[in-house]
Amino acid sequence: MGKDTIANIITSIRNADMNRKGMVRIPATNITENIVKILLREGFIENVRKHRESNKDFWVLTLRHRRNRKGPYKTILNLKRISRPGLRIYSNYQKIPRILGGMGIVILSTSRGIMTDREARLQGIGGEILCYIW
């Protein structure tokens, strides 16, 4: 049984968001770096910094929480892993699903790297659907 790093980071972010934690630490790999850049660019996280501890690199993510009178509430409503090691899901650019009518994002792994559904549609390429965020 292998490790599924994408499921691990999605679960870490979801758990920290549900418990209203301000920060979450995830292992730094090339895949997680690309996903973190997308989350930062799309506004789901506030800040990212790289942390080195005992010869291992980690990303420390600052989650974005909005404040109201009762306290902070979460911004990321849901993260869902779609393609997994036991069942890969692929889509061409015409059949990439739209999440909440375009309000959410789909993260894809394409031949040109990891990107969002909007970027893949603009470039006219499909790929493996990694996760939904809405």
Curated annotation (Swiss-Prot):
One of its GO terms (cellular component) is chloroplast. Keywords: Chloroplast, Plastid, Ribonucleoprotein, Ribosomal protein, RNA-binding, rRNA-binding. It is found in: Plastid, Chloroplast. One of its GO terms (molecular function) is rRNA binding. GO terms for biological process: translation. InterPro entries: Ribosomal_uS8, Ribosomal_uS8_CS, Ribosomal_uS8_sf. SUPFAM superfamilies: Ribosomal protein S8. Part of the 30S ribosomal subunit. HAMAP family: Ribosomal_uS8_B. Belongs to the universal ribosomal protein uS8 family. One of the primary rRNA binding proteins, it binds directly to 16S rRNA central domain where it helps coordinate assembly of the platform of the 30S subunit. This is Small ribosomal subunit protein uS8c. It comes from Cucumis sativus (Cucumber). The lineage of its organism: Eukaryota, Viridiplantae, Streptophyta, Embryophyta, Tracheophyta.
